[in-house]
């Protein structure tokens, strides 16, 4: 529903609800993590989490896009992340690895999402689900990657500053 002036009830012209997007990212993280651990089939993981998500208000289409995007582009995402890591992708903690893959997908394939939003969401997700200092690692990797991947947006300065 729009308010006068063309803004949605969420205060954005594009109608995107940031809260629902955040929930979708958290659920996508859980789905990618489950896929990494179980080695399950992408469609099964998406179907399971989409069914569970039906009971939680979230952006289901965005959730599905994130999970399908990460799972179908895993090799490319890992290759893109490798120069910014201090170890192999597989040696990165499973939660931080899932966070990095999701953020890399958004930074590389979802140019409609500002890089600062991607990085800040990744940091908050890593704080919530990751190891004690995992968010610091995620921030460092994504700050460096965003400068290269989103040159026009990030300019020569650092990325998030967080």
From Swiss-Prot:
MF term (GO), any: RNA binding
A biological process term (GO) from this entry: transcription antitermination
Organism superkingdom: Bacteria
Keyword Transcription: yes
SUPFAM superfamilies associated with the record: NusB-like (SSF48013)
UniProt similarity note: Belongs to the NusB family.
Cross-referenced NCBIfam families: nusB (TIGR01951)
Function as written in the Swiss-Prot or TrEMBL entry: Involved in transcription antitermination. Required for transcription of ribosomal RNA (rRNA) genes. Binds specifically to the boxA antiterminator sequence of the ribosomal RNA (rrn) operons.
The protein's name: Transcription antitermination protein NusB
Name of the gene encoding the protein in the UniProt record: nusB
